[in-house]
Swiss-Prot record:
This is TBC1 domain family member 14. Its main location: Golgi. The keyword Phosphoprotein applies. Pfam families: RabGAP-TBC. It comes from Mus musculus. It is found in: Golgi apparatus, cis-Golgi network; Golgi apparatus, trans-Golgi network. GO terms for cellular component: Golgi apparatus. The gene is Tbc1d14.
Length: 694
């Protein structure tokens, strides 16, 4: 191939590929472009038969072949050194022309460079100029044989992928067609032209610069080896050119195409095409006609955490996109007013919620402050002088407000007392007996305890099984008394030790809740002492020993004060035959620890330790008074269900406010006097209706 002259005034457009006609064909006269010798030329290494290149007649611009396509001025493209043009022509029988590639740097040099040597030709990196994205021009070429083409020049573009990405373009060129390409300025092209008897297809693959440069270095070595083999296989050169070598080229192009992973037929964006989010936002604001303001460092800082309307951050008033018709002025004003109304309502809701939270916080701070002051009062004034101050009005008022949790266990122990004189050593003895009994029952041992002679092994075994069952159902929401919990063994020890301490009472359902509340506020031994003395009280002993006559006496006394304080609800219950034992048994057995929230139950226990069993029935009347309006509209079934399963969110202040309105006097008789009178009148007690009219 001889050196061809190409003018430097092509505005950055370089020739990318040459297609030779078959032998015997002639080139037609070019209509738009003639190539002739010029003093300034681009030196192309000679690898095969000479191929003459002419200069462009128009040195300033290129014109489109189709008059319907506007002619665009093309600026000098940036040098892209990785575009390779592969040219293959049909081999004649007398010569073997291997597949070659030539280079052209971009922009074109102003002077004719010297021809490279053989070694330089082998080491040189093949490059080709790339057209700008807006360039679209037709180029017509001479063949080395000065013969005219038999058909008019045309180009058929089969498929072009989206610009700005890795392009994969397929051009269909006939035997005498020429190439007209449109290439982006930031892509490189690998063009393979074949001139055979078969219908010819030209594959143009545009890839990134870095990927193409690596492949060309591998292609140079492969092409050199292919050319050397073709010279040795002269008779079969046409066969290898059409099949084997083309297959290798196709494999190489497939490898080129596989470099980019395609999802649903779309080529992913290159790293260089990714834009910054800030730049994209700025471009959008410029298109929308709003000037972009630099973000302030204080822009995202909320001045007032309490009254900032958080809900409005997800509600943004935006104009329509630039590609859509603008809103009418009336519609835009209407939308803005609606937006402002929504923001105003959101601010009101946020303000109301913030005020509620602030009020709760203030109340909590007041409660914590009062608890702190109460702790100091209990520790410094009351507990050191317990015997003289526990019945004073000041202490009783503090008691009603609730004992601080830090001193609650100590106050409970002092208020319950230790009339049974139980010591820690006695607790250890009872616990050891309980463990020995558990072991003997598990191994099936004989009865060796003389004191347990009146109790069968079946009763003791049933009692132990009942303890195990009740422990699993004690405060299940806390998950601290169940198997594996931190207080499981302590609760099991107290209940087991009590069954050994009072075998005549044994274990009764409901004891586990009382023992659990004591464990939460006392040590194990102190909890056992308080538990034993508490169950020794007359009311608890009557219920846990299931003294039916005495239990009816307590129910009758309760109905006396029930009728005195809530006559309307009392008559409604009488009408529906709803007796007190339906709801009182569970409340008295567990001391409200199962029926009410734990915090509220502890406050009830505080006053119960001060006032005794009277406060248990007063609390029952307070609960009935709190829900009097609801209960009067219920029938028997719904009333029983409601009272046996009270709401879980009962506020302590409302409950104690209702309790404070209950008067525990009936005809100038207090609770103790009424209960004593009922115990004396056993006959009236058996009828179930107390008679206090004498």
């Amino acid at each position: 191939m001889t050196d061809g002259n190409l003018s430097t005034s092509m505005n950055g457009v370089a020739l990318m590929g040459i297609l030779d006609g078959r032998q015997g064909d002639s080139l037609q006269d070019l209509q738009h472009l003639s190539i002739k010798a010029a003093p300034r030329s681009l030196s192309v290494p000679e690898y095969g038969p000479s191929l003459k290149l002419g200069a462009l007649e128009d040195r300033h611009s290129l014109q489109s072949v189709d008059s319907g396509i506007p002619t665009l001025e093309i600026g000098n493209p940036e040098p892209v050194p990785c575009s390779v043009v592969h040219v293959k022509r049909k081999q004649s029988e007398s010569e073997i022309v291997p597949e070659r590639a030539f280079q052209s740097a971009c922009p074109l040099p102003s002077c004719t460079p010297s021809a490279p040597t053989c070694s330089e030709r082998e080491q040189v990196v093949r490059k080709s100029s790339t057209f700008p994205r807006t360039g679209y021009d037709s180029v017509k070429l001479y063949s080395p044989t000065s013969k005219a083409l038999s058909r008019s020049d045309n180009v058929s573009v089969c498929s072009v992928s989206s610009l700005g990405t890795e392009l994969s373009t397929t051009l269909s060129v006939s035997n005498e067609d020429i190439l007209d390409l449109m290439v982006t300025s930031n892509s490189s092209a690998i063009v393979t032209l074949e001139n055979d008897d078969d219908p010819q297809f030209t594959d143009v693959t545009l890839s990134s610069i870095n990927e193409t440069s690596d492949l060309h270095q591998q292609d140079c070595v492969a092409e050199t080896e292919e050319g050397r083999k073709l010279k040795l296989l002269h008779p079969f050169s046409h066969f290898f050119t059409r099949n084997l070598l083309a297959r290798k080229q196709n494999a190489r192009l497939d490898r080129q195409r596989d470099l980019g992973w395609k999802l649903f037929g779309k080529v992913p964006l290159r790293e260089t095409a990714q834009k910054d989010s800030k730049k994209t936002q700025k471009e959008y604001e410029d298109k929308a006609g709003r000037p972009s303001r630099p973000p302030s460092p204080k822009q995202n800082v909320r001045k007032n955490l309490d009254f900032e309307p958080l809900s409005t951050t997800a509600l943004i008033l935006e104009d329509r996109p630039a590609n859509l018709p603008a809103k009418p002025a009336e519609e835009a004003q209407k939308h803005r007013q609606q937006y402002e109304e929504m923001v105003l309502q959101a601010k009101k809701r946020e303000l109301k919620e913030a005020q509620r939270r602030r009020k709760q916080l203030e109340e909590r701070c007041k409660v914590e402050e009062s608890i702190g002051n109460a702790v100091l009062t209990w520790n410094n004034e009351i507990l050191p002088n317990w015997e003289t101050m526990w019945c004073s009005k000041k202490v009783r008022d503090l008691w009603w407000q609730g004992i601080p949790p830090s001193v609650r266990g100590k106050v409970w122990s002092l208020a319950i007392g230790n009339e049974l004189n139980i010591t820690h050593e006695l607790f250890d003895i009872c616990l050891a007996r309980a463990k020995e009994r558990w072991r003997s029952l598990s191994t099936g041992g004989s009865e060796v305890e003389n004191e347990d002679a009146g109790f069968s092994a079946a009763d003791r075994e049933a009692s132990l099984e009942l303890i195990k069952l009740d422990i699993s159902r004690t405060f299940p929401n806390l998950c601290i008394f169940q198997q594996g919990g931190p207080y499981h063994d302590m609760l099991h020890s107290i209940l087991g030790a009590y069954t050994c301490y009072r075998p005549d009472v044994g274990y009764v359902q409901g004891m586990s809740f009382i023992a659990a509340v004591l464990i939460l506020n006392l040590d194990t031994a102190d909890a056992f002492i308080a538990f034993s003395n508490l169950l020794n009280k007359p009311c608890q002993m009557a219920f846990f020993r299931v003294d039916h006559g005495l239990m009816l006496t307590y129910f009758a006394a309760f109905e006396v004060f029930f009728e005195e304080n809530l006559p309307k609800l009392f008559a409604h219950f009488k009408k529906n035959n709803l007796t007190a034992d339906i709801y009182l048994i569970d409340w008295i057995f567990t001391l409200y620890s199962k029926s009410l929230p734990l915090d509220l139950a502890c406050r009830i226990w505080d006053v119960f330790c001060r006032d005794g069993e009277e406060f248990l029935f007063r609390t029952a009347l307070g609960i009935l008074k709190l829900f009097e309006d609801i209960l009067t509209r219920m029938d028997f079934i719904h009333s029983a269900q409601f009272l046996t399963r009270l709401p879980e969110d009962l506020p302590a202040d409302e409950v104690f406010a209702a309790i404070s309105t209950v008067q525990m006097q009936s005809r100038n008789k207090k609770w103790a006097q009424v209960l004593s009178a009922l115990q004396k009148d056993s006959r009236e007690m058996e009828k179930g209706s107390p008679s206090l009219r004498h």
